[in-house]
Every structure is written in C-alpha cells, then in structure tokens.
C-alpha cells in the first residue's frame, strides 16, 4: 500500500471540506438582496481545414515472453498494441483511387549487457484486423515468418511489412475508424546469449 498516496488524498479532502465550510459561513452572515442570471454563449465554427487521416497506437511498449521453445529454437511471444486508423475526411477530400496502408519495421534487438544483437529478421508477426468496418474493405497483411523458418515470407520485420490496408479510402471514409493488431514472435537459436534485449518497431501510415 502506498502510504504517501493515502496521506496526500486525505489532505486534499480536508482542504476541500475547509473551503466548503468557509463558503457556508459567509452565506449565513450576509443577506441575499436578489439574484441575476447571466447567459453564457459560445459560437463554434465549422472546421474549414477539412478532415485528416491519422493513426494512433494503444501503448508505447510490449513485452515478449518465452512460449513454445524447442531444444533447437527458443521462441518468445507477445502482442502488438492495438493500432487505430481514423479518417475524418469527406469523400471529396480524398484523391480518386487512393488507399491507405500501415507498415511495420523493426530494428535489431540490442542486448542490455553487451550481448550480440539479435537481427530483426528473427522477429515475425501475424497481423489481425480487429474492426475492419461494416464494408469489410480493410484487410490484414500476410503473416511474416522469421529467418529461422522457411518459405518466401521468412524474412522477419526487417523492411516495411504490411499490417493492414484498404484499396479505396474514399469508399470507406464514412466508417471513420478501424483497428488492427498482430501476434508477435521472436525465434532464435538455442545458443542465444541470455539477458534483456530491446528493439524498436516503427509503424507507419501511408496513402
């Protein structure tokens, strides 16, 4: 239990109570000679600069924990924080034929105690659209395996891999918002040096 936190909260309540008592004392001491209402008006104009296409990520970090390792390969899994794409533009603000897409690229994993770096090619993902809108025109990218795997997609998150996209921004703009995330997995040789590692995964929105 954080004792200082509760002490601070108690002090705040005491101060509020003292202020309320002071106001009550002044009200009883003075006679009310009438009330006058004042209308408070505000004019909010329409935004003339138009809407925007933007992306946000629900968090600045995620952790990978060991899961599914074998005698030859160590595996660490985690989840990409939810990525939200928002479009507040009207259809006439969107260029004909435009489509937006989100790409991800990772740096190498750097060891906190001077261990050899783990290449970004050892990090893969399996994208997943959470809310693709009513039209279903937002789709996830292909699974990207690691350099420890085989196949044409066994390249890791080395260079701008696709998380999600739509091929027609204008057609779905009225839906306003879409979300996606991805299962992350790091695969290394069993001989990898122990210790803490950190990498930076950059997500970019393009149209």
Regions found by a protein language model. Give the residues of each.
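Signature of Gram-negative chaperone-usher
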Residues: 2-10, 19-207
């Amino acid at each position: 239990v954080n004792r200082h936190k509760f002490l601070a909260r108690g002090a705040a309540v005491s101060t509020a109570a003292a202020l309320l008592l002071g106001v009550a004392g002044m009200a009883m001491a003075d006679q009310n000679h009438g009330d006058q209402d004042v209308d408070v008006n505000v004019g909010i104009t329409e935004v003339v600069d138009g809407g925007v296409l933007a992306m946000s990520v629900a968090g600045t970090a995620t952790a990978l924990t060991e899961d599914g390792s074998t005698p030859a390969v160590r595996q660490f899994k985690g989840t990409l924080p939810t990525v939200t794409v928002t479009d507040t533009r009207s259809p006439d603000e969107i260029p004909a034929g435009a489509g937006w897409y989100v790409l991800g690229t990772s740096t190498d994993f750097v060891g906190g105690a001077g261990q050899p770096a783990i290449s970004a090619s050892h990090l893969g993902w399996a994208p997943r659209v959470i809310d693709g809108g009513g039209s279903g025109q937002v789709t996830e990218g292909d699974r990207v395996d690691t350099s420890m795997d085989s196949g044409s997609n066994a390249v890791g998150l080395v260079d701008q891999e696709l998380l999600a996209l739509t091929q027609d921004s204008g057609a779905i703009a009225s839906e306003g918002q879409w979300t996606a995330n991805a299962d992350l997995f790091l695969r290394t040789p069993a001989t990898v040096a122990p210790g803490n590692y950190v990498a930076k995964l950059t997500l970019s929105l393009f149209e």
